[in-house]
A protein has these predicted regions:
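Non-catalytic terminal/linker segments enriched in charged/polar, low-complexity residues
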Residues: 1-122, 149-152, 316-322
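Short glycine-/polar-rich loops that comprise or flank the Walker A/P-loop
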Residues: 4, 26-29, 39, 152-153, ...
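Flexible glycine-/small-residue-rich
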Residues: 11, 45-49, 129-132, 158, ...
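Short hydrophobic/aromatic beta-strand immediately N-terminal to the Walker A/P-loop
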Residues: 125-127
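Switch II (G3) loop of P-loop NTPases
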Residues: 129-132, 154-165, 172-190, 194-220
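Conserved lysine of the Walker
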Residues: 136
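Hydrophobic positions on the alpha1 helix immediately C-terminal to the Walker A/P-loop
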Residues: 139, 143, 169
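Conserved catalytic-core segment of NTP-binding enzymes
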Residues: 186-195, 202, 210-317
Length: 322
């Protein structure tokens, strides 16, 4: 018989964590490991019942996990320095990784305050920029779904009317929500849309694919920002080459874009390259997209979410290798 896989639980108090264990795994659950991290209590547990349907996959060490996920030597060195400074070196891999990413994220600029943006008296506009194939159109639709789930009906517009493919795709994605897509062909159209948009509205603007090595396209971003008076988000595709990703981030920086999101996290086992490039820059990682379906809305880039994705991707690659 194979041992049950371990499950991780974390909370403010031991009682809270044990309640989660009992609720999830039942009264026969067995505590495997326990400890404290960043003021929280954590435990790993197994269900206590044998299950031969799933092989036990041991949790890799944090160093192994970061290396397998493609993180740069700089990040590996930083982690080793961080880990050696911790008193409890035998802590669970997941807990140590979460603490490490919390430390990294705390060193980044503050995340965008969406609630404050919604409270503004003027319309709030957001637009996604990036090269062709980065997921701008699908992510725009995902944000529309996310806002609707919060009880906010967004206004969705598209500047991608020359190639028309992006516009048709966005219209098809939002048709099920009975949400129309405004077409914008010029900067004047952006001004007109915002002029007739009520205060407290949320405007999402899809943009055409850019040549990220063309100064003219950097100017286009500045023009969009000036007219939309909004916040641009750069999109990075997970799994790309580290050097190329760093060059794209340089393009964003030169275009005064400081907030980025990562897409296609579900399609790669190499999250380390894009995350290394972001964490080595002044960029703020705002969200992660781990599903091609618009119903699966963007995930806020919390430390535990990043670690869950890393664990999932490495375990998947090991299963295929076996």
């Amino acid at each position: 018989m194979q041992q049950q896989p371990t499950h991780f639980f974390e909370g403010k108090t031991l009682k809270e964590v044990l309640d989660h264990v009992t609720h999830s795994l039942g009264e026969e659950a067995v505590i495997w490991e326990s400890g404290e991290s960043e003021g929280n209590v954590w435990v790993t547990a197994i269900s206590g019942q044998e299950d031969s349907s799933q092989p036990h996959i041991p949790l890799p060490s944090p160093e192994e996990l970061l290396e397998e996920a493609g993180f740069s030597p700089e990040i590996l060195t930083n982690f080793c320095s961080f880990a050696s400074s911790r008193r409890k070196k035998s802590a669970d891999s997941r807990a140590r990784l979460i603490a490490f990413f919390k430390k990294i994220l705390a060193q980044r600029p503050s995340s965008f305050d969406f609630d404050a943006a919604l409270a503004q008296e003027a319309p709030t506009s957001f637009f996604l920029v990036g090269a062709t194939g980065q997921g701008k159109t699908v992510t725009t639709a995902k944000f529309a779904v996310s806002l609707i789930q919060q009880g906010i009906l967004p206004i969705v517009a598209s500047l991608d009317v020359i190639k028309s493919g992006g516009l048709f795709q966005l219209e098809a994605l939002l048709q099920t929500l009975d949400l129309p897509v405004q077409t914008l062909q010029t900067q004047k159209d952006i001004r007109s849309l915002l002029a007739k948009t009520p205060s407290h509205a949320f405007v999402l603007i899809d943009t055409p694919g850019l040549n990220l090595f063309d100064a003219a396209d950097r100017r286009r971003i500045q023009e969009w920002r000036a007219e939309a008076q909004g916040t641009p988000f750069g999109l990075l595709r997970a799994g790309g080459d580290l050097r190329e990703t760093e060059e794209i981030i340089d393009f964003f920086r030169e275009a005064d874009i400081t907030r980025v999101g990562v897409t296609h996290c579900d399609a790669t086992q190499r999250l380390g390259t894009v995350l290394s490039a972001i964490f080595s820059s002044p960029m703020t990682l705002e969200f992660l997209c781990d599903s091609p379906f618009i119903s699966q809305t963007p995930q806020t880039a919390f430390a535990d979410k990043i670690v869950d994705m890393l664990l999932s991707s490495v375990k998947s690659s090991r299963k295929r290798a076996a």
